[in-house]
Amino acid sequence: MSRQWDALVIGAGPAGLRAASVIAESGLEVVLVDEQAFPGGQIYRHVTAPGAEERFAEAADYRDGTELVRRFRRSGAEYLPETTVWFLEQDRILASRGEEVLDLRARNVIIAVGAMERPVPFRGWTLPGVMNAGAGDILLKTAGLLPETPVVLAGSGPLLYLVASHLIRKGHPLAAVLDQTPPSNMLKAAPHLPAGLLGLPLLLRGLSMLNDVRKSGTPVYRDVSGIEAQGADRLERVSFFCKGTVHTLDAATLLYHGG
């Protein structure tokens, strides 16, 4: 396959879908390339797949994601799902789709692959039952799978509380949230609050996630360090240091997010 477009977009998440839609609506020829079978990226993962509405923990995410995909499909942009780009040089892009190699040409390329959750090693991190928090959320969205209890979430950053909120809204109990964010980060962030108010909907969503955890009664340990996954053949316990004391919690699943 060899053809030239005005623009080629890599990544079918929110940014890639919007970019491809706007370009196509402007009358230009654009193709969107993505590794997944369905558009939506991570936040709207498989949002148009059968049964997605039941799997999504937040109705607003499902609504926003489906509308974004509908706009993209109405735009007339071309779409190459299950396609992996592995070479990019000037106006030439090589990609694989199944056993086929695609030779794609475009005058402009937009890379919208989003962020990638990084695995952070800690003691016991290779035990069965330990996984990235984002991976746990993907299993929920794509297959409706909930982690084995007791479930402990640990790490730092917004994704930690987003995953906690999703599990709580699905009625899935959490043993604890272990927040490793240093207290000093709150002071460092304070000067940016006025600018942050420009993104008020996102701030309100963050407060909603925190409120979900609070209302559920899930214990939250803050300024945590020294997290260790323990067990013989699989995860059995999580130990950590908090406020001068070593704590140990029974756990069958540890969802960790290190940024």
Task: Tell what function each PLM region has.
Residues 72-88, 93, 170-259:
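A Rossmann-like FAD-binding core segment of flavoenzymes
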Residues 41, 90, 120-121, 141, ...:
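Generic domain-boundary/flexible-linker signal
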Residues 1-10, 64-150, 158, 170, ...:
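FAD-binding core/adjacent interface of flavoenzyme oxidoreductases
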Residues 5-63, 67, 71, 154, ...:
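Beta1-alpha1 glycine-rich phosphate/pyrophosphate-binding loop at the start
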Residues 18, 22-23, 35, 109, ...:
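Hydrophobic/aromatic ligand-binding patch that stacks against planar heteroaromatic rings
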Residues 35-38, 48, 84-85, 114-116, ...:
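Short, ordered loop/turn segments at secondary-structure junctions
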Residues 41, 133-134, 138, 161, ...:
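Residues on a specific face of well-ordered alpha-helices
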